[in-house]
Amino acid sequence: NTIYVPLGMKAGLEKIVDVARRAGIPDSVEMVATPSVSLGAASPHVIDLANAYATFAAQGVHAKPFIINEVQGPNKGILFQGRIQAQEVFRKDVMADLTYALSKATTSGTAAVVGARVARPTAGKTGTSNDNASAWFNGYTPEVAASVAFYRDDATQTLNGIGGLTSVTGGSFPARIWAEFVKGYLKKAPVQEFPPPAYIGGIEPISFINSVPEMDPALIPPSPSPSPSNKKKR
């Protein structure tokens, strides 16, 4: 994942925060424009990430989530009706390329179990925090988006050992649960396809092998003074 640090710095850290906000991560979730923001250094709720991935599934249209759809009175009169508030926040071609990239994670990446079990177009991303203290899988199909998270009440405790696994990651239980939910949810639905990738900027690979992030000179510690030599001159 370290490649995303120089990539994020090249794209612009403020832009990363802006994209997250537009996708659906609310202002109540603290996000600081530092290099670690590219690695997920924030603490959103599960519904926040499900909402963000729903924006990707809807080809860049963000809809504000709501939990209560309808409230009926004693005479079955509708007292409250939830309304979809939607706005296009990303270009469709950008979302097509994003989906193409994320679909690789569910076919041959860390969440390959998703593609194998759902057996229809899927896209998503696993996430595992330091010391395996939390594990996530967020993903979508053309029809639905969902998020599954594992963590303990004490965020400092590791998940390792749960279910007999020595290492609990986003590609283990979270991905499996997500796959079973989506498989059941879409059991009788016709298979839909994602839009083809737009290949914005071309298809030539870009190398970051020799890319070194620039650091603020004020943060660079001074070089140590050379040790005095005890050798005698001849």
List PLM regions with ranges.
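A penicillin-recognizing enzyme superfamily signal
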Residues: S43-S207, E214-P221
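Active-site-adjacent helix/loop patches that line small-molecule binding or acyl-intermediate pockets
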Residues: N1-I25, M31-A58, K104
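Long, low-complexity, intrinsically disordered segments
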Residues: P222-R234
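Active-site-adjacent bridging/hinge elements
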Residues: V17-M31, R117, A149-Q157
